[in-house]
Amino acid sequence: MTAFLTTDQVAAIHDLQSGQPLRDRAVLAGAVNRALTGWGDDLLYPDAEAQAAVLLVSLCQAQAFVDGNKRTAWVACDVSLAINGLRIVDVSDEAVVDLMLAISTKALDESAAADWIRTHTVVAPVRRRP
């Protein structure tokens, strides 16, 4: 079963890296919860990579924060993957900037973002607090 970030957790991620306020909590909740879209027990986004991609794209494009939307989206995606035993590897800062700009300008959709994530992730042990 996939673990999902909550709206409060994503807001906390934002608060750690930006002094700017939340613009719209409902917009944030909608972006965070898109990965949970489905029918009954069947999710529209079938795996952790697709769920991280929809979180990444939704947060980046929804503009729920006054500032820091792309940074928050990237960190939330990374945390979402980590809590599901995956880790992004061998990616330069420039590649991340290019990815985020492509998403923010809608040149890259959720499916392409999921493919990018799958290409750059490896299975990693989930770290639990003692």
Language-model segments: residues:
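FIC/Doc superfamily catalytic core
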Residues: 1-130
